[in-house]
């Protein structure tokens, strides 16, 4: 248990994944990172992920309809729970394999990858992550957050930022009071 807490402290992933196995080394991703998938819906997620990382100052990211040249390979694995995912960066090929039980699972895996990139990268021009394998699935089906705009006004941009934050923390339900 203590070792697991130490690993969590090093990776700093929120919420804490079910299982994290680190190798102790890091992976420096190439200057041009390609996120690829054979699935059109996963490519739409990849495009959204790239735009979020670019907003955070990362560059050299693109998406591709093929897994062959991809640095980050997205796929669906029906053996996983619907919102579960595995993220594996332990290969000597310096690639990241991300499989989800559904599109939702892949999205949660991308949120974890973003947290790893932001935490481990000192310079956004040189992306780096720890070499690790994560197996995760939510413990609760309903994970919600509430925003009450009826009693306190928020701008559209503030609401969008709030939604991005709760999504990054794998919250799947947004309860919004407008009146």
Predicted regions: what is each one?
Residues 7-142:
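Contiguous, structured surface segment used for ligand recognition
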Residues 138-179:
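Substrate-binding cleft of carbohydrate-active enzyme catalytic domains
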Residues 1-7:
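C-terminal segment of classical bacterial N-terminal signal peptides
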């Amino acid at each position: 248990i203590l070792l697991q807490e130490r690993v969590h402290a090093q990776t700093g992933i929120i919420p804490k994944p079910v299982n994290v196995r680190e190798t102790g080394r890091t992976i420096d991703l190439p200057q041009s990172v390609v996120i690829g998938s054979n699935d059109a819906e996963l490519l739409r997620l990849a495009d959204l992920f790239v735009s979020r990382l670019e907003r955070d100052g990362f560059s050299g990211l693109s998406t591709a309809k093929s897994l062959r040249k991809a640095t980050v390979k997205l796929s669906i694995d029906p053996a996983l729970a619907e919102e579960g995912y595995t993220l594996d960066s332990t290969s000597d090929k310096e690639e990241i394999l991300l499989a989800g039980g559904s599109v939702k699972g892949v999205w949660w895996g991308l949120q974890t990858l973003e947290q790893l990139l932001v935490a481990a990268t000192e310079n956004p021009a040189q992306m780096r992550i720890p070499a690790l394998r994560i197996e995760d699935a939510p413990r609760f089906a309903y994970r919600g957050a509430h925003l009450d705009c009826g009693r306190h006004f928020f701008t559209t941009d503030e609401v969008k930022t709030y939604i991005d934050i709760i999504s990054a923390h794998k919250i799947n339900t947004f309860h919004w009071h407008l009146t």
